[in-house]
């Protein structure tokens, strides 16, 4: 069954700058989450770590692609996001936006 493309998924994959510790990076996460909660169209955010590839994966759901794009632009000049961004190797960063095309699959009850 095809799904309405009303929501938007944002996935950002990145590495940290050399010498940045996991603890140092995670110390900036709450400020970014608090900032995201205040953005129009924000639904949820989850930060994960891929130990095998030494990469971070930031997954954010938005109400629309417009909300996702506008928030991404505002984040780049946000004082709340700047400390986290300063720790990220921006050349390693890949940001992808997409819209759902099928119903989500859930575990059986």
Q: Which sequence ranges carry the predicted segments?
A:
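Short hydrophobic/aromatic beta-strand micro-patches
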Residues: 13-15, 59-61
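Short acidic, gly/pro-rich beta-turn/loop elements at beta-sheet edges
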Residues: 22-24, 57, 68-70, 105
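Glycine-rich beta-strand-turn "strand-cap" elements at beta-sheet edges
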Residues: 1-8, 14-17, 44-54, 80-109
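Short, surface-exposed ligand-recognition loops at beta-strand->loop->(often short) alpha-helix junctions
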Residues: 15-27
